[in-house]
A protein has these predicted regions:
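Short, conserved, GDST-rich strand-edge loop motifs in beta-rich repeat architectures
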Residues: 1-6, 44-61, 96, 114, ...
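Beta-propeller domains
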Residues: 101-166
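Surface-exposed loop and turn segments in beta-propeller and other repeat-based domains
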Residues: 20, 73-102, 147-148
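Signature of short aromatic-glycine-proline-rich micro-motifs recurring in repeat-based ectodomains
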Residues: 27-29, 47-50, 61, 92-112, ...
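Short coil/turn segments at the loop-to-beta-strand junctions that recur within blades
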Residues: 24-30, 81-85, 140, 147-152
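Blade-loop segments of beta-propeller domains
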Residues: 1-34
Length: 166
């Protein structure tokens, strides 16, 4: 349980371990990744404030991710429920069966730049056993890898031998 009721903050410390700042805007969880511009990518719980409770139980929560600057200020926020709705994946969590309370369980948000300089994230969505490539500028899914592994967690990108971008 968090030391701040109903919050899972992200904390910032200096290299000596001295507390510098915190952000309690969201319920942050699992990993965090930093891109080449020092933006922080971190999964969040309940990323949609306006979940239609006629479709989802009170226990249902939507995962998503936030992008923060190096001072922990929120730059952008994305909802997996909205990403799934807007990109043809909605049926994967909302078919004739109840989607349950945790249809996504986002474990990792791995940022990278493509060879044409687009900002992409790879999302590790445990409960769908899916890795989803998402263009954060165009707000659209590019591709997914489904069930290649079961309930994966961390995504790491290794440069090829020529250190080329994907």
């Amino acid at each position: 349980e968090s030391f701040i009721k109903d919050q899972d903050p992200i904390l910032k410390f200096d290299s000596c371990g001295n507390f510098m700042d915190l952000n309690i805007d969201e319920r942050y969880h699992h990993s965090l990744e930093v891109d080449s511009e020092n933006r922080i990518y971190v999964p969040i719980y309940n990323s949609t404030d306006n979940i239609d409770r006629s479709l989802y139980s009170e226990a249902f929560y939507d995962d998503g991710f936030s992008i923060l600057d190096s001072n922990l200020k929120n730059l952008a926020k994305f909802s997996l429920l909205n990403i799934y709705k807007n990109n043809g994946y909605f049926g994967d969590i909302h078919s004739e069966h109840n989607p349950g309370t945790d249809p996504f369980h986002l474990n990792d948000v791995q940022p990278f730049k493509t060879s044409d300089d687009r900002d992409i994230v790879l999302l590790s969505i445990r409960n769908n056993s899916r890795i989803l490539a998402f263009d954060i500028t165009k707000n659209n899914a590019l591709w997914s890898i489904d069930r290649a592994v079961s309930q994966q967690h961390d995504i790491d990108i290794f440069p090829d031998k020529n250190n080329e971008k994907i």
